[in-house]
């Protein structure tokens, strides 16, 4: 059986990656739902590129947005499975892994994948 510390293992991810992901997803949300309010001319090279995507591929942007969230849901569910497989049995720790992976995706999941916890015996 896993140790008490291993059963409650949780590690917060890199602040750098969390900031990058938050800003990127925030910008993506802005582009998908409020494209008319974006100051394209003030965004440097990103402005004309974003405007082109909004004008010519808005449906693709919307579908990609929802697909990204669906992938985050899948990653979160996989994080729960990994927690159980690696001996992280604390409900609080599992919830933290689920939420962190839901909001930050692979940046969180790679930390959990790298964790070398005790594996539970399968019956």
UniProtKB/Swiss-Prot annotation:
Any coiled-coil regions, as ranges? none
What domain of life? Eukaryota
Sorted keywords for this record are:
Acetylation, Membrane, Transmembrane, Transmembrane helix
Pfam families according to UniProt? TMEM254
Q: Which residues cross the membrane?
A: 15-35, 61-81, 95-115
What is its subcellular localisation? Membrane
Q: What Gene Ontology cellular component terms go with this record? A: membrane
- Protein name per the record: Transmembrane protein 254
Q: Which organism is it from?
A: Pongo abelii (Sumatran orangutan)
